[in-house]
Amino acid sequence: MRILLTNDDGIFAPGLEALRNALSDLAETIYIIAPDRERSATGHSITVHRPIRVREACHADGNCCGWIVDGTPADCVKLALESLLPETPDLVISGINLGPNLGTDVLYSGTVSAAMEGLINGVPSLAISLASHREAEFEEAAAFARRLLPLVFEYREIFTANTLLNINVPPGKPVGVRLTRLGNLRYADAVDRRVDPRGRYYYWMAGKPFSPDGHDPDTDIGAVKDRHISITPVKIDLTDYEALDALKKWPVDWKGS
């Protein structure tokens, strides 16, 4: 079993190290490639207007553990699968992210987008996040990834060319696991406008997350709030097929347009 690990928190992030330690004896080979610094909320952006620099990642003792990329999480996986790796991995795992990736936030998430890039390149992929900002709680998320890995390989038919698994682990001790759909996540007071010493406005993206749909236990947001691990299958195909069928019924000759 060959696994590619990545993240959006940076090559030396404790979540990535916790994941590597948890899976090291289950994999024949673990490759690691990650950004040179935190690249949260970069979405699926890739770097096209400047060169991308890659170097080996080495600890102070001289042991090298992977590649550092001065690009986005999607850059990392794209480079690994299309250029750097000597062989195609069996699985891409992105995480463990410090902080949740729930609901519509998956569209902003560098963590989920890195897994999506693996999927685009034909490799089954997972994204895993800790719904907490306390680094000491990575142990539970890493242990769940370890328990899940044999199931992922036994039932790998779930991974079509169109689907990845987005996993969110609640803080503390989870009380169970739920299979969920994406919730609807919004932010109250999302833009914080300030004034610099020269009288010019500048802005911070901030805000408190909330779900306008209220508490729904069938969503990833509701599951994590109920202290359950959430597993959500996420599709790369964003086509609305019902709307597509409805458009075909419009009195318009699309072919002649």
UniProtKB/Swiss-Prot annotation:
Residues that bind a divalent metal cation: 8-9, 40, 97
Known role: Nucleotidase that shows phosphatase activity on nucleoside 5'-monophosphates.
GO molecular function annotation: 3'-nucleotidase activity; 5'-nucleotidase activity; exopolyphosphatase activity; metal ion binding; nucleotide binding
Top-level class of the enzyme under EC nomenclature: hydrolase
Chief location category: cytoplasm
Key words, A-Z: Cytoplasm, Hydrolase, Metal-binding, Nucleotide-binding
Co-factor binding details: Binds 1 divalent metal cation per subunit.
Organism: Desulforudis audaxviator (strain MP104C)
GO cellular component, one term: cytoplasm
Name of the featured protein: 5'-nucleotidase SurE
EC identifiers of the protein: 3.1.3.5
Family to which the UniProt record says this protein belongs: Belongs to the SurE nucleotidase family.
Catalytic activity: a ribonucleoside 5'-phosphate + H2O = a ribonucleoside + phosphate
Cofactors: a divalent metal cation
Entry superkingdom: Bacteria
Compartments, record wording: Cytoplasm
